[in-house]
Every structure is written in structure tokens, then in C-alpha cells.
Amino acid sequence: MAVPKKKTSNSKRDSRRAHWNRKANLAAQRALSTGKSILTGRAKGFEYPTKDDDEDDDE
């Protein structure tokens, strides 16, 4: 069975964890920003169904 020969240093561990946290924070920030732009009506990059569109589909 494959086993690491040496223990990973604390600084390397902390660096990897910090990088992962940075990526997670960036993704969360982007999601929050997209949600805010949708709620304020400023989103122009994509379309999503509204009540007016639903009524047109029924007819």
C-alpha cells in the first residue's frame, strides 16, 4: 500500500488550506453578486422566466 514517506509541513498544509478557502470565498462572492443583480433587475447576461412570460406560454 502506498504511504507518504514524510509528514507534510504545517506551512504547506496551511498554504493549501488558505488557497482552498480563497477559492471558496471568491465563488461565494460571485454567487452573492449574481443574486443581488438579479434581485435589483440589473442582470443583463442571462434570461430567466418571469410571470409575464408564463402567461404568454399558456395562450
Curated annotation (Swiss-Prot):
Give Gene Ontology CC terms.
large ribosomal subunit
Please indicate if the UniProt record lists Thylakoid as a keyword. Answer: no
* Cell wall biogenesis/degradation found in the keyword field: no
The ranges of region (Disordered) come to: 1-59
What taxonomic ancestry is recorded? Bacteria, Bacillati, Cyanobacteriota, Cyanophyceae, Acaryochloridales
Instruction: Write down the species.
Output: Acaryochloris marina (strain MBIC 11017)
Q: Which family does it belong to?
A: Belongs to the bacterial ribosomal protein bL32 family.
Molecular function as annotated in GO: structural constituent of ribosome
Which keywords fit this entry according to its UniProt record? Ribonucleoprotein, Ribosomal protein
List where Basic residues composition bias occurs.
Answer: 1-22
Q: Which GO terms describe its biological process?
A: translation
PANTHER family this protein is in? 50S RIBOSOMAL PROTEIN L32, CHLOROPLASTIC (PTHR36083), LARGE RIBOSOMAL SUBUNIT PROTEIN BL32C (PTHR36083:SF1)
Write down what this protein is called.
Large ribosomal subunit protein bL32
